[in-house]
Amino acid sequence: MKKRNIYLDNLSFEDARKTLSDAFKSSELTGIETIAVYDSLNRVSASSVTALLSSPNHNASAMDGIAVIADNTEAADERNHLELKLGSGFKYVDTGDPITEPWNAVIMVEDLLEADERHVVIKSPARIWQHVRHVGEDIAAGELIIPSFQRIRAVDIGAMTAGGITELEVFRRPVVAILPTGTEIIEDPETMSEGAILDSNSRMFAAMVLDAGAEPLRLKPVIDDRQLIKEAFAGALERSDAVIIIAGSSAGTEDYSADTIRSFGEILFHGVAVKPGKPAIFGRAGNKPLIGLPGYPVSGYVIFDRLVKPLLELMQGIGSAAEEFRSGFLSRRVPSSLEHREFVRVKCGKVGGRTIVSPLNRGAGITMSLVHADGILEIPQESEGYEAGTEIEFRLTRPASEIDNRLVSIGSHDLLLDVITELMHKNGGRTGLSSTHQGSMGGVLAIRKGECHIAPVHLLNVEDGRYNEYLFGKYFQPEETALIKGVGRTQGFIVKPGNPKGLTGVDDLSGELVYINRQRGSGTRVLLDYLLEQKGIDPDSIDGYYREMTTHMAVASAVKSGTADAGLGVYSAAAVNGLDFIPLGNEEYDFVVRKDMLDDPSLQTFIDCLKSEEFASELGKLGGYELDEPGRIISFS
């Protein structure tokens, strides 16, 4: 039996940070280099910089106008205008021109009453040195411009240049080697085959290294061979100031990172009490950090963001940039284990003056949860989580300005939401759409609790076979809410090309096929349960009934990958994935909205998108939709 790794530690997040700060000192980690001032943006000064020249280096005119001798203008006032002659009484100057003897004041061109090429008339005297910039007024020779250990900004470059500085000493940017490992890892999407994984992690980490001010050295993936990995690691260590090895940090039989790091130095800790990201490894070879990041992208991101990035900033002699936090109210419960500090990706938006926070998929391999996230909620290790409605504080991962002008949507999923999001961004980006998929009933409850602006729904009234309108009066006060018409769409079974299981309808679900379901509360799940009840089919007889996905695309992906034979969804999801589709019938996909939102500019933008020709064109390309006055508002009071 192959030997498996074990985690040596379950170090708390706080202890992990302290261990790293104690193990590495910034003064020992990087050298110093001299570079041109104009190349120094975002670099860190290694020594103080003092001005060689004064700025301005001569008495200079601060305005366009005329230079005069102040004493010769004393006779001018409102009743006794004074005429001056070019040469003896004044000379023309532009902003920045030297003011030399005998001139000692400047009168702005706007204050001249009459002027020709050789004469001007003034109505008030000039004070000595009026509108004249003195030598060293901005920067004096010998004055400190920037201290050491300062991240250099654009204004610093301007000031140094004005002070006669052409070069300065900065800390050398640490070079961070990034070594992806895994036999399944490939770089070229054209060589993709079953079981292969594109090397996206090293690209993400290289960008994060750049963002932290360091220089990435991205290496080619190495297969799961202990000797080859060690050889590649040795080369990476020789060429860099720090090495990141990706994957191979957990407890698998082919996880070689810990052994490799131990071969070249010492392991400081292996295992951190965080979720996701527990398998992380940190070690050192001399003063060089050696880092093993988990292969799951979210796990790797969390460890890099919270532990590696501060370490790279330490190596450059700078503190971590200030982070922006915001408080908000959770739209649903977020449980957590007492064993870890948990980092939960969240989406948010302002509804009725409150920030509503919705947790996203918490899987360690869900890269898109990072893309969609507006922030990170950190749950302390000793906490069991938070109940729905709890006011919490979270860290923003995108600018607040992008969040505050959003239309918040909670409810059913459809690909048309992606189309609307793109159209709203094309509108100038003034308004966006923040969409969280919690199913139609999730949207109904969110509207009732004031947690969203709109709720996409497609809920069947089993008594009359109509969609959505019955919600008004049953769940909503008709005078407070309205319905925005969306689209008709075709629901049916998504199956593999050629329908190899011969699925024709719900009667075949309890046969020898594996099903993939939508989550409870979704309109698609409600439809399936209604059809099963009509046919008298026990859900327990369906293999996969309790295996749930939150979107139509996730259902289609499961069928395409072979982990399921069929799932109920919309035609467009099947078409996009090249799958076959067994139609069951049409339904109505609409939007519930509070009436007090109807005049809101962001909602008007949303409605305009629904009514647009571009929206109709894009849905025509997807297929499976019928448009009958999308954007029409129906009131039930």
Regions found by a protein language model. Give the residues of each.
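Periplasmic-binding protein-like
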Residues: 478-490, 579-608, 631
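Phosphate-interaction motifs
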Residues: 2-167, 326-330, 379, 391
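Ligand-binding cleft/hinge of the Venus flytrap
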Residues: 419-429, 507, 518, 524-547
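A ligand-binding cleft/hinge motif common to bilobed small-molecule-binding domains
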Residues: 456-474, 556-585
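Phosphate-binding glycine-rich loops and their immediate beta-loop-alpha structural context
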Residues: 134-245, 405-424, 430-431, 435
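Flexible glycine/proline-rich
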Residues: 14-17, 32-37, 42, 47, ...
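N-terminal segment of the mature folded domain
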Residues: 425-505
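Short loop->beta-strand "edge-of-pocket" segments that line small-molecule binding or catalytic clefts
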Residues: 404-413, 506-526
